[in-house]
Swiss-Prot record:
Inhibited by barium and cesium. It is found in: Cell membrane. SUPFAM superfamilies: NAD(P)-binding Rossmann-fold domains, TrkA C-terminal domain-like, Voltage-gated potassium channels. This is Potassium channel protein 1. Residues 246-331 form the RCK C-terminal domain. One of its GO terms (cellular component) is plasma membrane. Keywords: Cell membrane, Ion channel, Ion transport, Membrane, Potassium, Potassium channel, Potassium transport, Transmembrane, Transmembrane helix, Transport. Residues 1-6, 82-333 are cytoplasmic. InterPro entries: 2pore_dom_K_chnl, K_chnl_dom, NAD(P)-bd_dom_sf, RCK_C, RCK_C_sf, RCK_N, Trk_Ktr_HKT_K-transport. It holds the Pfam family TrkA_C.
Length: 333
């Protein structure tokens, strides 16, 4: 239980004790509410004016019990309040409140489960692309260190396998989730939980063992990745064709921020049009890499490729070109 939660609990207990004692004094002593309430407050504060004292046996007995319980509750609460300020919880509390306010405003964001080596790289890439994201990790110290370096990060301390934690990250409004915690079993469980809470969310999950890849897909992951396989394949490509790989990397890492994106054709004006007559290249400047029709993907589509509503277009270009393409194929002015 967090310190501020202990303070809230202590205050609630104190208020309940005061109200209960007030009712008892009204009942056994016959006092009006204000007199009973006043006496209860004075007693628990240990001021002890002595202007009102119970005369009945039950009244005196209730005050004895009340004093022990009340003084204990006050001491507990004051101790936590002191700890709240002395141990730096005050700053942490308001940082948490501010962060939760930012999370409430999130929409169409990504959730990164696990802030280890992979999680940090993913977060850096998202920051470069100005993509909103939330980090979930159970290591509080790790996230505090990350926030010291970058106060703009949005982090949640907790177990990503917990539905409550995923709900805190607004999973119902999230666009995607990336599960890169250290345990394959946890990645499978996170995938299952995420799909249950948001069936439409796009999930990429990490597998330490190649044998886990199929399990992640069956659990609901849209993509399952084994870093060792991907890393090994990349190293092999670099060794075999260093010039080609370097060229591809230079394209992606240019100052113009070249990217590859996918869009669904929604513009009715493009329905049943040939690619060469669509005006995509002329109006946007983006290059079409592939067109996906149902389960069939046409790579390097020829000019006579027919475009239909619902087709998925994979395109390459600058951010500005791709934004123009997005507006054009989706029919947004």
């Amino acid at each position: 239980m967090e310190t501020y939660e202990k303070i809230e609990l202590g205050i609630i207990v104190i208020i309940l004790l005061i109200l209960i004692e007030s009712v008892i004094l009204m009942t056994v002593e016959g006092w009006d509410f204000f007199t009973a309430f006043y006496t209860a407050v004075v007693t628990i504060s240990t001021v002890g004016y002595g202007d009102y004292t119970p005369q009945t046996f039950l009244g005196k007995l209730s005050v004895i019990i009340y004093i022990f319980a009340g003084v204990g509750a006050v001491a507990y609460t004051m101790g936590n309040i002191a700890s709240f300020f002395i141990e730096g919880h005050f700053r942490k509390y308001f940082r948490l409140r501010k962060m939760m306010d930012r999370i409430k405003k999130l929409n169409n964001h990504y959730i990164i489960c696990g802030y280890g080596r992979l999680g940090k790289v993913i977060a850096e890439e998202f920051k470069k692309c100005n993509i909103p994201f939330v980090i979930i990790d159970s290591d509080e110290k790790l996230l505090e260190e990350a926030l010291e370096k970058d106060p703009n990060l949005i982090c949640i301390v907790g177990d990503a396998t917990s539905d409550d934690i995923l709900k805190k990250a607004k999973i119902e409004k999230a666009k995607g989730l990336i599960s890169v915690v250290s345990s394959d079993a946890e990645n499978v469980f996170i995938t299952l939980s995420a799909k249950k809470l948001n069936p439409n969310i796009y999930i990429v999950a990490k597998a330490e063992k190649p044998s886990t890849l199929d399990k992640l897909i069956k659990a609901g992951a849209d993509r399952a990745v084994c870093p060792y396989i991907v890393g090994g394949m990349e190293i092999a490509r670099i060794a075999i064709n260093p010039d080609i790989v370097e060229f591809i990397h230079s394209l992606v890492a240019t100052e113009e921020d070249m990217e590859v994106r996918r869009y669904i054709v929604k513009n009715k004006e493009l329905d049943n049009k040939l690619l060469k007559d669509s005006g995509i290249r002329e109006k946007t400047g983006a290059t079409i890499l592939a067109v996906k029709k149902g389960d069939k993907t046409i790579t390097s589509p020829p000019p006579d490729t027919v475009i239909n509503i619902g087709d998925i277009i994979y395109a390459f270009g600058t951010k500005e070109q791709l934004e123009k393409l997005k507006r054009y194929v989706e029919g947004v002015e």
